[in-house]
């Protein structure tokens, strides 16, 4: 296994005082009964007056919300209940004008079962997403101690999940592969998953996000 890369911490982080916000229970700006991102922007001065200079924004991406947004359907789209991508970019800009920073909750270990990646991974025909998730090689075989779901996909295999049925585990490989379906942690399939997640981070960093709080930040490989 490769050692973790070393990068300097951003200077602002040393003095950061975070205010954590779960969007739906904060400020409702449009009267629909659900907190939203424009509501957060309206309260930036209030948050700064409390002595906070950074915001940790809990999951705000498109999701069926079967697990409070920790089941992401589209990493590059803000959940419609919270607003739009432009609303989130406006929050970044407004925070920066106040010398504040915003980090996003990133869930890299699994997606929603409604994510397009998973829909493609379920197909019988091999494609670029067949190994984006962890699948066994037979629908009657379990996950060697890992939780799994079988019999719900056209392909022959069961998929490994992290928590709930709605959260299929993304494939970052196995530290010590022992089965034919267990991909190596440094193999091309695991690298493709890593590259996809890096692409998500670059997408939001390029639009003004200051960083990420990584959910389940321990190494994503199985079998460690």
Each model region followed by its residue ranges:
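Loop/turn elements at helix/coil->beta-strand transitions in domains of secreted/extracellular proteins
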Residues: 15-16, 50-55, 96-103, 209-212
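Conserved, mostly hydrophobic/aromatic
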Residues: 21, 47, 57, 75, ...
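Hydrophobic or amphipathic alpha-helical targeting/insertion segments
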Residues: 91-126
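Conserved structural scaffold segments of CAZyme catalytic domains across common CAZy folds
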Residues: 1-45, 49-50, 162-164, 171-174
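Alpha-amylase-like alpha-glycosidases and glucanotransferases acting on alpha-linked glucans and related
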Residues: 8-18, 22, 112-223
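Catalytic domains of carbohydrate-active enzymes, especially glycoside hydrolases
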Residues: 39-64, 199-211
């Amino acid at each position: 296994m490769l050692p973790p890369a070393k990068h300097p911490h951003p200077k602002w982080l040393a003095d950061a005082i975070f205010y954590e916000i779960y969007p739906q229970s904060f400020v409702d700006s449009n009267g629909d009964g659900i907190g939203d991102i424009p509501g957060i922007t309206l309260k930036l001065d209030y948050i700064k007056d409390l002595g906070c200079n950074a915001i940790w924004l809990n999951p705000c991406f498109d999701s069926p919300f079967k697990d409070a947004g920790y089941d992401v359907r589209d990493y590059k789209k803000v959940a419609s209940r919270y607003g739009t991508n432009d609303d989130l970019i406006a929050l970044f800009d407004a925070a920066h004008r106040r010398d504040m920073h915003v980090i996003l909750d990133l869930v890299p270990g699994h997606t929603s079962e409604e994510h397009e990646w998973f829909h493609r991974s379920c197909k019988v025909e091999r494609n670029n997403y067949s190994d984006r998730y962890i699948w066994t090689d037979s629908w009657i075989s379990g996950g060697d101690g890992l939780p799994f779901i079988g019999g719900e996909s056209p392909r022959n295999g069961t998929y490994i999940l992290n928590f709930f049925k709605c959260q299929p585990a993304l494939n970052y490989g196995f530290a010590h592969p022992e089965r034919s379906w267990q991909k190596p942690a440094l193999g091309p399939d695991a690298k493709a998953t890593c590259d996809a997640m890096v692409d998500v981070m670059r997408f939001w960093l390029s639009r003004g996000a200051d960083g990420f709080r990584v959910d389940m930040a321990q190494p994503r490989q199985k079998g460690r």
